[in-house]
């Protein structure tokens, strides 16, 4: 049986997974999830510089923004599943995904970069 490390066991499991297409409920942009963190991992200066400060103790996501070269880092409370069935257009999509099936992206075989490398 796989056990989470004690320090992670108290965190909420992310509702979205890599490949899910989401919509930001506040700013209304669409994007695709590429990764998640159990809690906000951004530094305090970045967090305080945002227009809003959602709870840090919830999942946060790395999102490729549709029709943009941008990557955002929203909290789970800022996102909802996008059920339009429409694809996301982003220059980095091929770095993470190989296909789009049934409204979500399929992970490719390219190894993802290690954090802090």
Where are these regions (language model features)?
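Mixed-charge, Lys/Arg-rich low-complexity intrinsically disordered regions
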Residues: 1-21, 27-30, 37-40, 111-117
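Sequence-level detector for tyrosine residue identity
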Residues: 11, 27-29, 47, 61, ...
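Structured beta-strand/turn binding interfaces of compact recognition modules in eukaryotic regulators
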Residues: 25, 34, 66
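Surface loops and adjacent helix of pleckstrin homology
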Residues: 34-36, 76
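Short, solvent-exposed secondary-structure boundary/capping segments
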Residues: 40-49
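Phosphate-recognition beta-domain surfaces
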Residues: 52
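Intrinsically disordered, low-complexity, charged/polar segments
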Residues: 56-117
């Amino acid at each position: 049986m796989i056990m989470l490390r004690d320090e992670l066991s108290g965190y909420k499991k992310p509702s979205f997974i890599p490949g899910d297409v989401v919509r930001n409920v506040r700013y209304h942009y669409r994007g695709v999830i590429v990764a998640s963190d159990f809690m906000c991992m951004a530094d305090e200066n970045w967090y305080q510089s945002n227009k809003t400060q959602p709870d840090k103790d919830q999942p946060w996501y790395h999102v490729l923004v549709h029709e943009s070269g941008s990557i955002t880092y929203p909290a789970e409370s800022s996102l909802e599943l996008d059920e339009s069935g429409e694809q996301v257009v982003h220059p980095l999509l091929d770095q993470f995904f190989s296909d789009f099936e049934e409204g979500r992206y399929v992970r490719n075989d390219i190894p993802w970069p290690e954090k802090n490398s």
